[in-house]
């Protein structure tokens, strides 16, 4: 229900603003339609006027097309994706991953049914019951040792059952550990971050980090180059073999294991 003009005038009077500055925010059938509704109400223009900035009409063509695509998606067209981590009690802990999945669904005209799973609940015995019938699994980043064995069991299940898998940050590091343990037979493989005495530290501390003792705010940050293997899935997705990606890490892949891991 739209605000009647007399109510708009009354709000403007008692709030000591111009009537054009009274902006209504109606209930929308799609969250992403709200910015367009606010633009139609003149919110952008009013903000520019208040801040004495030049105002212009934005080109929302791509945004409108995205919303049209969202509304065309059939409810029964779903892709089930699990996010397996240890911060799942607070969904916003993985908000960037969740939003990325939703936007991927918009681009591919499918609904993404996201299942948040606590990695501490994943064991050899529970993996099948918790991870079956999934179309994909994501193990995102995190800190500390808690829940890591569950992540490794998750990754093993995905590999053995041909479930598409994406490891992000610590998730990819645990994928290296899983492969080393269960495919290469290096049973005690681990990250040196969690087991400094492991005989097979397939993930180890970066050389430039070894002399850093103050841990707060000292990770390697920023964009770094990466060479992708020719013909690999990653190179096909990027469409090139040299990429630059942002990093925030203290530990990395141990290149002493490059040959044995690449061979398999």
Which residue ranges define each predicted feature?
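N-terminal beta1-alpha1 cap of cysteine-dependent amidohydrolase-like domains
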Residues: 1-264
